[in-house]
């Protein structure tokens, strides 16, 4: 299939590489052009603009936030004028996803397909893809999704449903990290090591991947290089808050999580992993 890919950060580069590996014809674009070089060396075409990348069957965007997606779609040389079905893998607001769906409706079509998984999952094609949009559009994209991931979840025909699932999932991940970090701080202050607590928890009732993956990160203080940077986590929690406000859903845990993300960014800088909230929690308890 002829595919355009826009957004070549660590996640996007890995996803695009897997599309190449699966034999798809790929054009790539990134705001910093040098990010495209490794993929071009492997056979991708370096598109001259987002719209150039969108001269394809499908154009995928994997960008940091709403403003980056808006620039790629609506800016000069944006993809809205292209012929490709637009698939957004970005974690964006529900409101922007609704706007994109409306604006693409009379053109090529739009699918929201955010992913769950850290960079190593992207590199090994083990992502989980959450897709929403017209069934025929998702059918077209499913071979592409399976080149990058291990499972596709279809969550409805309204594209923003996938973004709501992704934001809800990210809130649950961050809440699990918050709870583990608080529990580890309590245990450690009472003389029980973090590793010991984690072994008990994951060996009994908390064996899910989120506890195993982030528990190890918290035990080892493995916060750099960031698999998912704290400012992006804070951005996502702000999007959760916007969705909760729009739906009048109280989410008190969200406020705690956001405060700890703000604290660790202020204390450690923007290159810290979002699991670095554990540092802010320890400092609050006088152990950091």
Question: What annotation goes with each model-predicted range?
Answer:
Residues 91-170:
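Rossmann-fold dinucleotide-binding core
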Residues 161-285:
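Helical "substrate-binding/catalytic lid" subdomain
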Residues 15-16, 35, 100, 144, ...:
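Hydrophobic residues within alpha-helices
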Residues 50-108:
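Rossmann-fold NAD(P) dinucleotide-binding segment
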Residues 26, 46, 110-111, 152, ...:
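Hydrophobic beta-strand scaffold residues
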């Amino acid at each position: 299939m002829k595919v355009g890919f826009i957004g070549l950060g660590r996640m996007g580069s890995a996803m695009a590489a897997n599309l190449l590996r699966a034999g798809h014809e790929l054009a790539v674009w990134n705001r910093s052009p040098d990010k495209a070089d490794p993929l071009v060396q492997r056979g991708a075409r370096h598109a001259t603009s987002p719209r150039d990348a969108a001269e394809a069957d499908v154009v995928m965007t994997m960008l940091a936030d709403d403003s980056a997606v808006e620039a790629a779609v609506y800016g000069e040389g944006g993809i809205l004028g292209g012929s490709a079905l637009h698939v957004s893998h970005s974690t964006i607001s529900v409101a922007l996803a609704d706007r994109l769906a409306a604006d693409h409706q009379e053109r090529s079509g739009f699918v929201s397909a955010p992913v769950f998984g850290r960079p190593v999952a992207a590199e090994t094609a083990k992502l989980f893809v959450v897709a929403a949009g017209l069934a025929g559009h998702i059918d077209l994209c499913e071979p592409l999704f399976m080149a990058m991931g291990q499972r596709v979840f279809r969550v409805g025909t309204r594209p923003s449903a996938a973004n709501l699932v992704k934001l809800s999932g990210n809130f649950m991940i961050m809440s699990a990290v918050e709870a583990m970090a608080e529990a580890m701080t309590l245990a450690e202050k009472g003389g029980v090591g973090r590793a010991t607590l984690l072994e008990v928890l994951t060996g009994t009732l908390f064996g899910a991947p989120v506890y195993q993956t982030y528990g190890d990160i918290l035990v080892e203080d493995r916060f750099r290089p960031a698999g998912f940077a704290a400012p992006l986590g804070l951005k996502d929690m702000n999007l959760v808050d916007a969705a909760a406000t729009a739906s009048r859903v109280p989410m008190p845990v969200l406020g705690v999580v956001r405060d700890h993300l703000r604290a660790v960014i202020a204390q450690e800088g923007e290159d810290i992993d979002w699991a670095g909230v554990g540092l802010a929690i320890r400092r609050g308890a006088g152990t950091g």
